[in-house]
């Protein structure tokens, strides 16, 4: 059962840009209430969709370089990468079904059926 991978600025290139499947990056912080709401949703999606998408988490308090480069000013922010390029940016918390629907717009293999 896949879980979101905690990454650092140093891991960003190898885990996100060079990944062999789409990657959803969750920019978060431990003190952020909406981030704590999104966390379990991302864990479910990571487990249910592990063949289709990789989910990683970047703590912006501990890793400010990438967040700054990508102009992440609000959290939670999620950026979807496909073939090493950002294709969607989601700011704020979202219900699981809404997030799956949004991801499926860019990742054909994402199942939006309720599980």
Where are these regions (language model features)?
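Conserved redox-active cysteine motifs that mediate thiol-disulfide chemistry
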Residues: 27-41
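Conserved helix-turn-beta segment immediately C-terminal to the redox Cys motif
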Residues: 21-22, 39-58
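Structural microenvironment flanking redox-active thiols in thiol-disulfide oxidoreductases
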Residues: 60-67
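Conserved Rossmann-like nucleotide-binding pocket used by diverse enzymes
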Residues: 3, 8, 28, 54-56
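Non-catalytic, surface beta->alpha helical segment in thiol-disulfide oxidoreductase systems
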Residues: 74, 80-112
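A short beta-strand-turn-helix
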Residues: 4-22, 64
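Short pre-active-site segment immediately N-terminal to redox-active cysteine/selenocysteine motifs
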Residues: 20-21, 27-31, 74
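N-terminal targeting signals for export/organelle localization
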Residues: 1-4, 108-115
